[in-house]
Regions:
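N-terminal transmembrane alpha-helices
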Residues: 1-34, 47-62, 66, 89-96, ...
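Short alpha-helical transmembrane segments in multi-pass integral membrane proteins
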Residues: 1-13, 67-130, 177-228, 285-352, ...
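Transmembrane helical elements of multi-pass membrane transporters/channels
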Residues: 7-26, 126, 137, 160, ...
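Helix-terminus/linker motif at the lipid-water interface of multi-pass membrane proteins
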Residues: 21-40, 107-114, 170-177, 238-265, ...
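Small-residue-rich hydrophobic transmembrane alpha-helices
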Residues: 39-97, 134-152, 259-317, 323, ...
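Hydrophobic transmembrane alpha-helices of multi-pass small-molecule transporters
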Residues: 51-54, 164-168, 194-198, 268-272, ...
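Short runs within selected transmembrane alpha-helices of multi-pass transporters and secretion channels
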Residues: 60, 126-145, 153-161, 182-197, ...
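Structural signal for membrane-spanning alpha-helices in multi-pass inner-membrane proteins
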Residues: 99, 142, 168, 172, ...
Length: 439
C-alpha cells in the first residue's frame, strides 16, 4: 500500500502543479509584456479562476469520490462520469454569457479602473467563454485518478501546462496577440489535458462507464456533498484575492495589489502541492473506507500528514532563503516599491502554510470517508469565514502586515475547529466503521 500511496500522491502533486502553471505562465509573460499593470489585472481576475475551478472541482472531484466509494461497495456507477460532465457544462453557461456580453462590467465589479479594464477585457472574455473546458477538466482527471490511472491524469495535466507555457510565448510575442494570446493559450490548455486522459478511457484498463442517464439533482447533490471541500479549497483563493485586493487597494494602491499578485501566484504552487497530496490520497482512502478497512484508512491518514509536515518545512526554507529571487521572476521592471511590499508579504503570508497544508489534508480525508459535515465546516472556515474576518480585523489593527498574517490566523482557527468536531463525533465514527466491517 505504501508504494501505491507514494505513486498516487507523487503523480497527483505533479499534476496539480501542472494545473497551477496555467496561471503562473500567464503571470510571468504578462509581467514581461505589461509590467505592474498587467500583474494588477491578472490578480483582479484570480477570483474568476477561483470560482470556475471551484465549481468544476466540486462536481468533478465530488462525483469521482462518490464513484470510488460506490464502486468499492459493488454499486452501479456506469452513469457517474457522463452526469459529471453534463452538470459541468450546464454550470458553465452563465460564465460564457458574461464573457460574451459583459466582460467590462465583470472587471469593474472586481475593482478594475478604466485603464485596467481596457488592458484585460479580451483576456477575461476568452477565459469565460472557455469555462466548459476548465470545469470538465476536473471530471476527466479526477475519474482517471479514482479509476487507478493517476499517471495518466498527471501526464495530461503536465502536457496541458507545457502547451500553455510554449503557446503563451508564441501567441503573445511572435504572433503579436498580447494579453489576448495569453488567454487563448490558457483556454486551450484543458483541452490538451482532457485529450490525454481520454487515452485511459479508451483503454482496456478503464472501468468508468459512459452510459447516458437523465441529469438528476439528487445524484448531483449526493456527489457535491463530497466535493464541497474541493469547492471551497479552490474558491478560497478567489475569495482571499477579492478581500485582499479591496483591503490592499485602500492601504497601498495598485502597487500593493501588484505585490499581492506576486504573493498570490506563488501561493498557487503551494496550494497545488497540498491539494495534490490530498487528492492523491483520497482515492485510496475512499477505496479502503468503502471496503470497511479502518486500519488501512488510519494508516493512509498518518502517511498523508507526515508528508504534509515535511513539505511545509521545505516550503518555509525556500521562502525564507530565496525571497527576493522568487519576487524577481515577476518583477521585470525591477520596481523597488513592488519588491519591498512583496518581500515582507511573501514571508508573512507563507507562515499560514504551516497550518494550511494540514487543514487541506484533514478536510479531504473527511470527504473521502463520507463525513461531509466536518469537511464542509472546515472548508468554509478556512476558505471564506475565518479568512475574511481575520483579514478585516487584522488590517485595521496592523495595516498591510495584518493582511499578510491573516492566513496564519484563519488556518489556526480552522485547525482547532476541525479537531473539536472530530473529537466530538468520534463515537459515531467508530460505530460506522464497525458496521462497514460487518457488511
Amino acid at each position: 500500500m505504501l508504494k501505491r500511496f507514494t505513486r498516487y500522491v507523487t503523480q497527483s502533486v505533479a499534476g496539480m502543479i501542472g494545473i497551477s502553471v496555467y496561471v503562473l505562465a500567464d503571470t510571468f509573460f504578462i509581467s514581461v509584456y505589461s509590467g505592474a499593470d498587467g500583474l494588477a489585472v491578472l490578480n483582479l481576475i484570480l477570483p474568476v479562476y477561483g470560482l470556475i475551478y471551484a465549481i468544476g472541482a466540486m462536481i468533478g472531484i465530488g462525483s469521482a469520490t462518490r464513484y470510488a466509494i460506490s464502486r468499492a461497495k459493488g454499486k452501479n456507477t456506469e452513469h457517474y462520469f457522463v452526469q459529471s460532465v453534463t452538470w459541468s457544462i450546464l454550470a458553465a453557461v452563465p460564465f460564457m454569457l458574461i464573457g460574451i456580453f459583459i466582460p467590462d462590467k465583470a472587471l469593474a465589479l472586481l475593482g478594475a479602473d478604466a485603464g485596467l479594464i481596457g488592458l484585460g477585457r479580451n483576456y477575461v472574455r476568452i477565459i469565460l467563454i472557455a469555462t466548459p473546458f476548465f470545469m470538465s477538466n476536473y471530471t476527466f482527471t479526477a475519474f482517471a485518478r479514482n479509476d487507478g490511472a493517476p499517471s495518466v491524469a498527471m501526464i495530461g495535466s503536465i502536457s496541458g501546462s507545457i502547451f500553455n507555457i510554449i503557446f503563451d510565448y508564441i501567441f503573445m510575442f511572435p504572433v503579436g496577440l498580447g494579453f489576448s494570446g495569453a488567454g487563448l493559450a490558457t483556454a486551450i490548455c484543458p483541452i490538451v489535458t482532457m485529450s490525454v486522459c481520454t487515452i485511459h478511457y479508451r483503454s482496456s484498463r478503464n472501468h468508468v462507464g459512459f452510459h447516458w442517464k437523465k441529469p438528476s439533482f439528487r445524484h448531483l447533490i449526493s456527489c457535491c456533498q463530497l466535493g464541497v471541500s474541493a469547492f471551497v479549497g479552490e474558491l478560497s483563493s478567489g475569495v482571499i484575492a477579492i478581500v485582499f485586493n479591496f483591503l490592499i487597494l485602500g492601504i497601498a494602491g495598485n502597487m500593493g495589489v501588484a505585490a499581492y499578485g506576486v504573493v498570490a501566484n506563488l501561493s498557487i504552487v503551494a496550494f497545488a502541492i497540498f491539494n495534490g497530496l490530498a487528492q492523491g490520497a483520497q482515492p485510496l482512502i475512499s477505496e479502503s473506507y468503502g471496503k470497511g478497512q479502518p486500519t488501512q484508512v488510519r494508516k493512509l491518514l498518518k502517511w498523508s500528514l507526515f508528508v504534509c509536515l515535511a513539505v511545509e518545512a521545505l516550503i518555509q526554507l525556500i521562502i525564507w532563503t530565496s525571497t527576493d529571487t522568487l519576487i524577481s521572476i515577476f518583477n521585470s521592471e525591477n520596481n523597488v516599491q513592488l519588491l519591498n511590499y512583496a518581500h515582507i508579504g511573501l514571508r508573512l503570508y507563507f507562515l499560514g502554510f504551516i497550518v494550511a497544508g494540514i487543514n487541506i489534508v484533514l478536510v479531504a480525508y473527511f470527504s473521502a470517508v463520507d463525513e461531509p459535515k466536518i469537511a464542509i465546516v472546515g472548508s468554509f472556515l478556512r476558505g471564506i469565514v475565518a479568512i475574511v474576518i481575520c483579514a478585516v480585523i487584522l488590517a485595521k489593527l496592523f495595516g498591510l502586515n495584518g493582511i499578510w498574517i491573516s492566513l496564519l490566523a484563519a488556518e489556526t482557527v480552522t485547525f482547532l475547529t476541525i479537531l473539536f468536531l472530530a473529537y466530538k463525533d468520534r463515537r459515531k465514527r467508530i460505530k460506522r466503521y464497525c458496521s462497514l466491517r460487518s457488511q
